[in-house]
Structure formats: structure tokens, C-alpha cells
From Swiss-Prot:
It comes from the Bacteria. It catalyses: urea + 2 H2O + H(+) = hydrogencarbonate + 2 NH4(+). One of its GO terms (molecular function) is urease activity. Its EC number is 3.5.1.5. One of its GO terms (cellular component) is urease complex. This is Urease subunit beta. Signal peptide: none annotated. Heterotrimer of UreA (gamma), UreB (beta) and UreC (alpha) subunits. Three heterotrimers associate to form the active enzyme. Keywords: Cytoplasm, Hydrolase.
Length: 106
């Protein structure tokens, strides 16, 4: 067996499906601004930058369906579809732009 390396992660062989069996909402998003906008994987999408035009009511309680720690960048004039999945766990949204600051299901 090879020596352990601090911080090293050893993964089992094979594939892992992220967010399996989660309900997916697809929204069309347009960047109406003059600057790029980047949204991270766990940002409450409803509260994303105001230059992004999309159905904010449909995005309530949802985040991007992308790997943790990654983001999607919307260039000025971009118009694309994104997949969103619901927050899970306690379903509390605190911070971001301060629009919710509490439970989503209250």
C-alpha cells in the first residue's frame, strides 16, 4: 500500500450521480447587464443578481444543479437554460440578499 498523503482523497472506482432523484426545474436566464454575473452552486438562485432576468418565483428555494464549489457565469447578453434543484435539509435560507432569512416552508 502506498504511503498516505495529508489531505489526499481516495475514491472508489466507478461513477457517482450527483443529485439523483431530485426534482429539477429548468429556467431560461438572460443577463441584461453590461458585466458578467457568476452564480455559485449553493446560492439561493431567486436572490441572484438583479441583472439576471428569469422567473424568480419559480426559483424560490432552489439552487443550481451543478457540482458543489462550482459556478455558472452569465456573460452580458447571454440567454441560456439552467437546471435548479430544491434546497434540502432544514430548508432555511439565511443571508444572500436577505430576502428570506428563515425557513422556506413557513
Amino acid at each position: 500500500m502506498a504511503p498516505l498523503i495529508p489531505g489526499e482523497l481516495l475514491a472508489e472506482p466507478g461513477e457517482l450521480e450527483l443529485n439523483a432523484n431530485r426534482e429539477v426545474t429548468t429556467l431560461t436566464v438572460a443577463n441584461s447587464g453590461d458585466r458578467p454575473v457568476q452564480v455559485g452552486s449553493h446560492f439561493h438562485f431567486q436572490e441572484a443578481n438583479a441583472a439576471l432576468i428569469f422567473d424568480r418565483d419559480a426559483a424560490r428555494g432552489q439552487r443550481l444543479d451543478i457540482p458543489a464549489g462550482t459556478a455558472i457565469r452569465f456573460e452580458p447578453g447571454d440567454n441560456r437554460d439552467v437546471n435548479l434543484i430544491p434546497f434540502s435539509g432544514a430548508r432555511r435560507v439565511v443571508g444572500f440578499n436577505g430576502n428570506i432569512n428563515g425557513p422556506l416552508d413557513a
